[in-house]
A protein has these predicted regions:
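Alpha/beta-hydrolase fold nucleophile elbow
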Residues: 95-107
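Alpha-helical segments flanking ligand/cofactor-binding loops in enzyme cores
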Residues: 33, 114-115, 166
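Glycine-rich nucleophile elbow surrounding the catalytic serine of serine-hydrolase chemistry
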Residues: 105-117
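Conserved hydrolase catalytic core segment
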Residues: 118-124
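Cap/lid segment of the alpha/beta-hydrolase catalytic domain
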Residues: 5-92, 132-142, 150
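Mobile cap/lid helix-loop segments that gate and shape the active-site cleft of serine hydrolases
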Residues: 124-166, 170-171
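Short beta-strand-to-loop junctions in surface cap/lid or active-site-entrance loops
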Residues: 1-2
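Gly/Ala-rich phosphate-binding loop of Rossmann-like dinucleotide-binding domains
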Residues: 36, 117-118
Length: 174
């Protein structure tokens, strides 16, 4: 019988020991184990740069790559695409009830939960944990200097999190 499923999106954490990456997901595996023990299918995916997926998450402030924005690149967009592809994979699994797929995550994973729920109607419920701010805090208060680029979505319309929440509705966003 197909089971309800959770797409678990990793936040940020220390991932390399002695130069070897064990993936960011090792810090969150106990969450997936709890979900499995309680009757859910759970897929945990790594974050860009902070696990097994090579790339740069902190490009704008750490590497002064603000030009990325003008070129249409954002690590939030890359994370959203990774989530979409994870949902594509989950749809191929017979143990997954595709009508009951939720998403959650902490920190950066909380931010990705907002993105994927707004972008993909296959998410039936989203439960982001932390990982959000607003445009003023991100830019004016310089929150960007202490967080990675994925925590806020860059967009020409100056949309903020309330607008993203509207895109999730009427599905639950807790």
């Amino acid at each position: 019988e197909p089971l309800p499923t959770v797409l678990y999106l990793c936040g940020h954490g220390r991932v390399k020991r002695n130069g070897i990456s064990y993936g960011n997901k090792v810090h969150y595996q106990h969450h997936g184990a709890w979900l499995a023990q309680n009757g859910y299918v759970c897929l945990i995916i790594d974050s860009l740069q902070l696990g097994e997926i090579e790339g740069i998450h902190h490009g704008t402030y750490r590497y002064d790559r603000w030009w990325w924005i003008n070129r249409g690149y954002t690590s939030a967009g890359v994370e959203a695409w990774n989530c979409i592809r994870a949902l594509d994979y989950l749809e191929t699994r017979t143990e997954v009830d595709v009508s009951r797929i939720g998403c959650t995550g902490r920190s950066g994973g909380g931010a990705y939960s907002w993105w994927i729920a707004a972008l993909d109607p296959r998410i039936s419920v989203a439960v982001p944990v932390a990982g959000i701010t607003d445009l003023r805090n991100h830019v004016i208060d310089d929150c960007v200097s202490g967080h990675c680029d994925c925590m806020y979505f860059v967009n020409q319309f100056a949309w903020d999190y309330p607008r993203v929440a509207q895109m999730v509705a009427p599905r639950p966003l807790m």
